[in-house]
Structure formats: structure tokens, C-alpha cells
């Protein structure tokens, strides 16, 4: 068993209270602006010096128990009264050291010292119990306030609710506290309702969350943007997109400006429900209501149209992006090209591939593979070779499947067989299907590039002679 050392606190405090100079013993300065540079003199009858010095000594201790012993020793001295900050510092130290049984003793001393109990000390209590992940202790702090004849403030209620709903199994206790808080003189505010609505939505209890929203209005608690956003997300999560749209209309009619996340949630839900007309109308409506669509909103709409084989409508969305000053990214182009290929519009897809590369984006190998496969299926060898050449010139990756389609088109039978064997070895060596030819064989990339150019030249000459 390890024994704690016995400290000579009298010696410690004699050192602590040694004169700073022959003429400035116990001299400190207040920090308030109206008393700037006005000296504060500790009680000269106190043998251990000023409360400020004791506070600093307590704060400097890494051992919470030693800090508590210093606190207790100072408390026993005649004519000494701890500062309020000393109590707060000690509560934090004891809480973080998990000496929770000693905290009540500090509270009792704080009360007996004549200090009025303020919300700050209970805020500290909630903080230490929350950090220790002790929801029961957090909940008990509410009743501890009442025990000390202190009426909790809405911020205390909200912090307690926030902690409780973040722990599995404590939602019902949070709800009971919420319902009883009015009986104790604590009026829940918008934040209180939002915390519980969010928790019930995540717990798949949308009906309770919506009832809470109704109670807000009955009790003249004004909802905010977050209140609507929470419910919109809850309705969309349950697939009730029409209910979510009604909330949006109510929100707009009351003068609220929905945030971007609310619009993103609605657009996603409308697209998944294949209500593309409504989704596009919402996209156009955003700008009129003070929220310019961003990249996420446009990409959501492009994906929605492409999923329903409406690539030309998706192309219109891309054009809208540009006209509204929002630049497409690689996801925008990749989604659109994929949608065009799915509908057999390979020439259109090739144009957007070239535009994509010209803007500095690197096409995923699936994009070039989709285009090459499509052109080859229609016997458009030159167009397929064009795609390969454009991608290679940009130093991008081609999938091995793409090469297997292209090589027979540009090489004779003997060359094709040799290159095919080489590719098989290369893919085995690299253990990947997207290996670049230029990385696995000296000169092979240049060789195939020259073959592509020759193939295209021959195709042009044949067309000229027809």
C-alpha cells in the first residue's frame, strides 16, 4: 500500500506569504477596468496570505488530492475565505481525477462560506460529469440545484438534455426531465425542443418529434431554422417527402431561409422517389429564396436524371451550373458521361470527356472504358481510338479491359497475340486492373500510340476513296 506523504502546509504557506519586497507585502492589483491599478490588500490577520495566492497554489497542483488538502488547510485558518474561483478550480480537478465523492464536500464548504450559489458552479459540475460519461450524475445535478434552492436556467436544462440524449437508454429520462422542468420553474426554450426532436427522429420516433413541434407553437416557443431542418430530415428519412415539402413551404411562408443541408436532403429524397420534376423546380426555386444552389445540389440533380435515363435533362443541369457561376467537378462529368453512355449517346459522352480533360480533371478509367466499349459495339473504331489517344496523351490510366478491346483493332494477329501475353504478365505483376501501359513496358506505350495514329490515318484515307 502506497502511503501519501505528509506535507508541512504551514511551511508551504510561510514560503508562499514571504514578502515580495519590504514595502509591498500582500499587494495585488484588481483586473476590473474601473478599479485599474487599485491595490487589493489581503487581510493582514490571515497567516497564509491572500485568497489569490492560495488559488494559484491549488491551480498549480497536478494531484487533485493534494489540491484538496491545501484547500482544506486554508479553510481552517482564521480570517481566511477562499475565492469563488478556488472552488471552481478544485471541482474541475476532483472531477477530472474521478474523485466525485469529494465534490459534495467542496459544495458544502462553498455554501457555508457565505458565497451565493451561482449557475457557474453547477455548469462546472455538469461539465465534469459529462466528461466522465456519467449521465446519472449529470441528471442528479438538476435536482442538486433545487436542493441548494437554486432555480436551474434553460442553459443548464439544455446541457443536461444534450448529455442524456447522447447516451443510449437515456432518451426517456431526458423526456421526463423536459416535461417536469416547467413544474420547477424552468421554461424550455427552442434549443430544448430541438434537442429532443433530433433525438426522437434519430430513434425512429418521428410522431413524437412532430408532436413536440406542435407543442412549441402552442406554448409560444418560436421554432428556428434548426427546428424545421430536424423535422425535414426526419420526414425524408422515413420516405415521407411530401410531408417534408409541406414543412419547407411553412418555413418559407414564415420568413425563414432554409439552409443548404435542408435543400440537399429534400433534393435527394425527391430524386430517390423519382419526383424529378418537383426536384428540378425546387432547384430553380432555391435561388429565388436566397440560397444559391451549390455543387452538391447540382450533382444530386444530375445523378437523379441519369438514374432515370434522362441524360439530356442532366446535360441541361450541367449547363445551368455554368450559367449560374458554379463550376462542375469530376463527379459532375463522370455521372453525366455514364448517363449518356447508358442511353447510347457515345458521341455526346466523348465531347464531355474532352471538355472534362480540357478543364484539368482526370477521368476515372471506367469513363474511358465505357466510351470505348460503346464505340466498339457499334463498329466505330476510329472514335474508340480517339478516346484512347486523348486519355493517353493526358497521362491517364486505361483499364486492362479497355486495352483488350482496342489492341485487336489496331494490330495484326501476331502483334495482338504478343501484346496480349505481355499485358497478362504485366497485370499479374502489378496485381491491378488499371495498370498504365507506359508504366510496365519500355516503349510499348509509344508503340501503341503510333499504331492508333496509323489506324486513324488509314480510316480517313479509306473514307476519302469511297
Swiss-Prot record:
InterPro entries: Pentatricopeptide_rpt, TPR-like_helical_dom_sf. Its main location: mitochondrion. It is found in: Mitochondrion. It comes from the Eukaryota. The lineage of its organism: Eukaryota, Viridiplantae, Streptophyta, Embryophyta, Tracheophyta. The keyword Heme does not apply. This is Pentatricopeptide repeat-containing protein At4g01400, mitochondrial. Residues 1-34 form a transit peptide. GO terms for cellular component: cytosol; mitochondrion. PPR repeats lie at residues 118-152, 153-188, 189-223, 224-258, 259-293, 294-328, 329-363, 364-398. Pfam families: PPR, PPR_1, PPR_2. PANTHER family: PENTACOTRIPEPTIDE-REPEAT REGION OF PRORP DOMAIN-CONTAINING PROTEIN, PPR_LONG DOMAIN-CONTAINING PROTEIN. Belongs to the PPR family. P subfamily. It comes from Arabidopsis thaliana. Keywords: Mitochondrion, Repeat, Transit peptide. GO terms for biological process: Group II intron splicing; mitochondrial respiratory chain complex I assembly; mitochondrial RNA processing.
Amino acid at each position: 500500500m502506497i502511503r501519501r506523504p505528509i506535507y508541512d502546509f504551514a511551511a508551504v504557506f510561510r514560503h508562499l506569504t514571504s514578502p515580495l519586497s519590504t514595502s509591498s507585502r500582500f499587494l495585488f492589483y484588481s483586473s476590473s477596468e474601473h478599479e485599474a491599478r487599485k491595490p487589493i490588500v489581503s487581510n493582514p490577520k490571515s497567516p497564509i496570505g491572500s485568497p489569490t495566492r492560495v488559488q494559484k497554489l491549488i491551480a498549480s497542483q497536478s494531484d487533485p488530492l493534494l489540491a484538496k488538502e491545501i484547500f482544506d488547510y486554508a479553510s481552517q485558518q482564521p480570517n481566511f475565505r477562499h475565492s469563488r474561483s478556488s472552488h471552481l478550480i478544485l471541482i474541475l480537478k476532483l472531477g477530472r481525477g474521478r474523485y466525485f465523492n469529494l465534490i459534495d464536500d467542496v459544495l458544502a464548504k462553498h455554501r457555508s462560506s457565505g458565497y451565493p450559489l451561482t449557475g457557474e458552479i453547477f455548469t462546472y459540475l455538469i461539465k465534469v460529469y459529462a466528461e466522465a460519461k456519467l449521465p446519472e450524475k449529470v441528471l442528479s445535478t438538476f435536482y442538486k440545484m433545487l436542493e441548494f434552492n437554486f432555480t436551474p436556467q434553460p442553459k443548464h436544462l439544455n446541457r443536461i438534455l444534450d448529455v442524456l440524449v447522447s447516451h443510449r437508454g437515456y432518451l426517456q429520462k431526458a423526456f421526463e426531465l423536459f416535461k417536469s422542468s416547467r413544474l420547477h420553474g424552468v421554461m424550455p426554450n427552442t434549443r430544448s425542443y430541438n434537442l429532443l426532436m433530433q433525438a426522437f427522429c434519430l430513434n425512429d420516433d418521428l410522431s413524437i418529434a412532430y408532436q413536440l413541434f406542435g407543442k412549441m407553437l402552442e406554448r409560444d416557443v418560436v421554432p428556428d431554422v434548426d427546428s424545421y431542418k430536424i423535422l425535414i430530415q426526419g420526414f425524408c428519412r422515413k420516405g415521407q417527402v411530401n410531408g417534408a415539402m409541406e414543412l419547407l413551404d411553412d418555413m418559407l411562408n414564415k420568413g425563414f431561409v432554409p439552409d443548404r443541408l435542408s435543400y440537399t436532403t429534400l433534393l435527394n429524397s425527391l430524386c430517390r422517389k423519382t419526383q424529378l420534376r418537383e426536384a428540378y423546380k425546387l432547384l430553380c426555386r432555391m435561388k429565388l429564396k436566397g440560397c444559391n444552389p451549390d455543387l452538391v445540389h447540382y450533382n444530386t440533380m444530375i445523378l437523379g436524371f441519369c438514374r432515370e435515363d434522362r441524360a439530356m435533362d442532366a446535360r441541361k443541369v450541367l449547363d445551368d451550373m455554368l450559367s449560374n457561376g458554379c463550376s462542375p467537378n469530376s463527379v459532375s462529368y463522370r455521372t453525366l458521361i455514364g448517363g449518356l453512355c447508358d442511353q447510347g449517346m457515345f458521341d455526346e459522352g466523348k465531347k464531355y470527356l474532352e471538355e472534362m480533360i480540357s478543364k484539368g480533371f482526370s477521368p476515372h478509367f471506367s469513363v474511358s472504358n465505357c466510351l470505348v466499349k460503346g464505340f466498339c459495339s457499334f463498329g466505330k473504331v476510329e472514335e474508340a481510338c480517339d478516346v484512347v489517344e486523348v486519355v493517353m496523351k493526358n497521362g491517364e490510366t486505361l483499364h486492362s479491359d479497355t486495352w483488350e478491346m482496342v489492341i485487336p483493332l489496331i494490330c495484326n494477329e501476331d502483334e495482338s497475340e504478343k501484346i496480349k501475353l505481355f499485358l497478362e504478365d504485366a497485370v499479374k505483376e502489378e496485381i491491378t486492373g488499371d495498370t498504365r501501359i507506359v508504366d510496365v513496358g519500355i516503349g510499348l506505350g509509344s508503340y501503341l500510340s503510333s499504331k492508333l495514329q496509323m489506324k486513324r490515318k488509314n480510316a480517313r484515307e479509306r473514307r476519302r476513296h469511297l
